[in-house]
Amino acid sequence: MKVLISSPCSASVIIQYGIKSWPIWECEPSKFQWNYDDKEICLIIEGRAKISTQNGAIYVIKAGDLVEFPAGLNCEWEVTKSIKKHYRLGS
């Protein structure tokens, strides 16, 4: 399973999808396991994290990135700089 990253996310995409009205999630530097039961699309507002998947892929996400996590993904998050994101679950 692949994590898709669009960097930087354009202002037109933010407006088109109404991203600024999506809920916000925040996390201090930490390391934890996460399983995505549903697809998630998120816009990283602040911070940085390293995402390591079970198949050995490593992704670094940062402020300005639009990220899509597929349903069924199991991964480890390592938040290296306090992160804040708008997110939407499902299709």
Give names to the regions the model predicted.
Residues 1-3, 7, 21, 84-91:
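Double-stranded beta-helix
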Residues 8-10, 18-37, 70-71:
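Conserved short histidine dyad/triad with adjacent acidic residue
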Residues 16, 32-36, 53, 59-60, ...:
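Short histidine-centered beta-strand/loop micro-motifs
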Residues 34, 51, 85-87:
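Short hydrophobic/aromatic-rich beta-strand segments that constitute the beta-sheet cores
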Residues 36-51:
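Short, conserved beta-strand element in jelly-roll/cupin
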Residues 55-71:
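Short acidic-glycine-tyrosine-enriched beta hairpin
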Residues 71-91:
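Ligand-binding loop in jelly-roll beta-barrel domains
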